[in-house]
Regions:
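Short, well-ordered beta-strand core segments
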Residues: 35-37, 57, 135, 173, ...
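Short beta-strand segments
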Residues: 12-14, 90-92, 119, 148-149, ...
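Conserved anion/nucleotide-ligand pocket segment
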Residues: 155-201
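Class I S-adenosyl-L-methionine
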Residues: 1-20, 25-122, 127, 227, ...
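Signature of uroporphyrinogen-III synthase
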Residues: 4, 18, 64, 70-74, ...
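Class I SAM-dependent methyltransferase SAM-binding "motif I" and its flanking Rossmann-like core
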Residues: 93-169, 214, 366-372, 428
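Short internal beta-strands
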Residues: 32-42, 199-204, 346-350, 470-475
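Glycine-rich beta-alpha junction loops
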Residues: 43, 151-152, 179-181, 204-209, ...
């Protein structure tokens, strides 16, 4: 019987200008379903975390916009992968049809008979304007806006741009990809009759923590941009709207704007913290210290045997989000659900763990005011005397609870539901940032993570005395562990959560700014 050809589909999707929160819901849905993602170098890497693990992530252009492979090669790859039955997302910075060459790819797909869909994105111009504080149209300032290429087809002998028409344009001009031609663009606009006092600005890395905005006039902006040594990607804005920046600028006022922060949580738990950092104007750098994985299959029967005896325990104690997730995964695997916990009271070490329990329909009966094992143990020693307590835990961790509870006559049993392993080394990017000082902060969320951070520094031949990266600790216990390793802790969270770490960094920066 002849095989049936199954054709996939290609989604030409806009990723927005940089901030990962600006991707559309439709594009995010397609990323989650994709078999393959081909993305531009201008795409924020955090967006790739929305894809499934089987996706091949292959950059087609570099961050500075230079080409790795030709447009023809990209077209051929899209067609070949779709013919192989794959769902392909072609992810482009900004909008696919606004100087994104998306229409060329769509035409190639149409000619080859490949189904495709175009998903608009927030344009780079829109993102740059609104994150920099420019309103391109305004009743009293500008009735029109023009998007203009600053980098035309290099194979053409003559320019298609009519600078005399642009000089007369009754509104805002936005030039894409024009930083290297900034002086020439300003010269031609002035030569065509636009006043040299016309406000102008350059926006680099729009909507990212590394965003830079330089403003001036047509006469001064080339020198100002050169003085700041601006780099692509960038846009040039020409028009009266540039004067609005003093009034409308908001992004640079965010409390963590321009601050890079190392997120040391396990990779699969880093996204929520990364989103918090982005919303505060910062740049998350995901650098997990430990890897979390399931227990070995031979150890699973012991977990199942414990589930047979859940009715024997008066208390269940959860000391991590991972412990909650893995406990309920094994519980469901055994054919049980939350009703199996009806006889026990539940203790959680912190709000994050308690919230994770709530996601499974369980309200914690007790959460200590101070999110430390010592506080949890002291409270349980009073509440659970003579009772059976099951501690759901990882293969490694602090062993404070057993001593505290057993001394109080509590019958403690430990149930290991997941493994945690140290990562082998920092990535090369993290090492480079630590050595260059471009990673400004790192958050340490447990004593074991503090010790592992110190160990990886040693492996990378970075000595604590040379480290310019500031350290924020989630608790005094974690701070002491860091101090024991020779690390200097800049601040300690009042609330022992990652939100507490970020709040501590904000407070530390404000205090430093006040004293400087």
């Amino acid at each position: 019987m002849p095989s049936v050809s199954v054709t996939g589909k290609v989604y030409l999707a806009g990723a927005g200008p940089g901030d990962p929160g600006l991707i559309t819901l439709r594009a995010a849905e397609c990323l989650a379903e994709a078999d393959l993602v081909l993305y531009d170098g201008l795409v924020n890497p955090l967006l790739l975390r929305r894809t499934r693990g089987i996706c091949e992530r292959t950059a087609r252009t570099r961050r500075d916009g230079t080409t790795i492979v030709s447009q023809q090669e990209i077209n051929e790859r899209l067609i070949a992968e779709a013919r192989a039955g794959k769902v392909v997302v072609r992810l482009k910075g900004g909008d696919p049809y606004i100087f994104g060459r998306g229409s060329e790819e769509a035409a190639a797909l149409q000619a080859a008979g490949i189904p495709f869909e175009v998903i608009p994105g927030v344009t780079a111009a829109t993102g740059a304007g609104e994150y920099a504080g420019f309103s391109f149209t305004h009743r009293e300032i500008s009735s029109a806006v023009a998007f203009v290429t600053g980098h035309e087809d290099p194979t053409r002998d003559a320019s298609r741009l009519d600078f005399e028409a642009l000089a007369r344009f009754p509104g805002t001009l936005v030039f894409y990809m024009g930083l290297n031609r900034l002086t020439e663009i300003c010269r031609q606009l002035i030569a065509a009759g636009m006043p040299e006092t016309t406000p102008a600005a350059v926006v680099c890395h729009a909507s990212l923590a590394t965003q830079q905005v330089v403003d001036g006039t047509l006469a001064t902006i080339p020198h100002e941009a050169s003085k700041r040594q601006l780099k692509p990607p960038s846009l040039i804005v020409v028009g009266e709207c540039v004067k609005q920046r003093a009034q409308l600028s908001w992004y640079e006022q965010l409390p963590l704007f321009g601050v890079s922060i190392g997120v040391t949580r396990p990779d699969e738990q880093a996204d929520d913290v990364s989103s918090q950092i982005v919303r505060l104007g910062g740049e998350p750098v995901i650098m997990p210290m430990i890897e979390v994985g399931p227990v070995a299959e031979p150890d699973v029967p012991a977990i199942q045997e414990t589930f047979e005896r859940l009715h024997e325990f008066q208390w269940l104690v959860f000391t991590s989000v991972n412990g909650v997730s893995e406990f309920f995964r094994h519980l469901q695997r055994s054919g049980r659900d939350a009703r199996a916990l009806h006889a026990a009271r539940i203790a959680a070490i912190g709000t994050s763990t308690a919230l994770k329990l709530e996601s499974f329909g369980i309200q914690a009966d007790f959460v200590p005011a101070e999110f430390r094992a010592e506080s949890l143990g002291a409270a349980l020693a009073e509440r659970a005397q003579g009772q059976n307590v099951l501690w759901v835990r990882a293969s490694r961790g602090r062993d404070v609870l057993p001593g505290l509870l057993q001394d109080a006559g509590v019958h403690l049993e430990q149930l290991v539901v997941y493994e945690n392993r140290d990562v082998a080394a920092f990535t090369s990017d993290v090492v480079a940032r630590l050595k260059s000082g471009t990673l400004q902060w790192v958050g340490l969320s447990s004593p074991s993570i503090a010790r592992q951070f110190a160990q990886l520094l040693k492996m990378a031949e970075i000595f604590p005395a040379e480290l310019t990266t500031k350290i924020a600790a989630i608790s005094s216990v974690t701070a002491r562990a860091a101090d024991d390793c020779g690390l200097t802790v800049e601040c300690i969270a009042r609330n022992s959560t990652w939100q507490g770490i970020l709040d501590a960094i904000v407070s530390s920066r404000r205090l430093q700014s006040h004293h400087s």
